[in-house]
Amino acid sequence: MTARLIVMDIDSTLINQEVIDLLGEEAGVGEQVARITERAMRGELDFKQALEERVELLAGLDKSVFERTFTRVTFTPGALELVRSAHSKGWKVGVVSGGFHEVADKIVAAADIDFCLANHLEVVDGKLTGKLAADIVTKESKLIQLLDWAVGCGVDMAHTVAIGDGANDIPMIQAAGTGIAFCAKPKTREAAPFTIDERNLMLAMDIILRD
């Protein structure tokens, strides 16, 4: 069977929530953060600037917030089945996220996902500082990681799959052999070769095997 690589976004794709919005709720600024998130995902705001603005609002949160936030996360219907199905075929699965390793790593472990790229939040003396600890994961970063993982796995780009919902997923969706907009924002839907409008990630397998 042909070796393949599936790369997905996390927030609103692999899971039903936007982790940064959940963190915003913990900080008492949930609505403000959610409004910025929605505009950023629609491509109406510069993603880097929008992320920095939202992270600033999280300053002062205790690092215990990561575990609490993870307990509120639910996987999208079909997500775990898609990962298991891919692994049963010998395929690899990775996630690329503008979210945060502090929660993403727990999600990845629970879903048995092979690779993960995400942002790191700066924590000093057990508290979030409101800053990021490393370079921001951008739409360009997501694309580059897809390309790097494909090379590392020995998978031809024609046999890669990219799935996402936001404007920052468009470059990887367009570069992959099979690019899927999943319950996506209008700008992403228009840019994607394939779309799924039902919250069932196993529908992606039908597209992959048909393509």
Model-derived features with residue positions:
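Alpha-helical substrate-recognition element adjacent to the catalytic core
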Residues: 1-121, 125, 199
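C-terminal cap/substrate-recognition subdomain and adjoining C-terminal extension
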Residues: 70-211
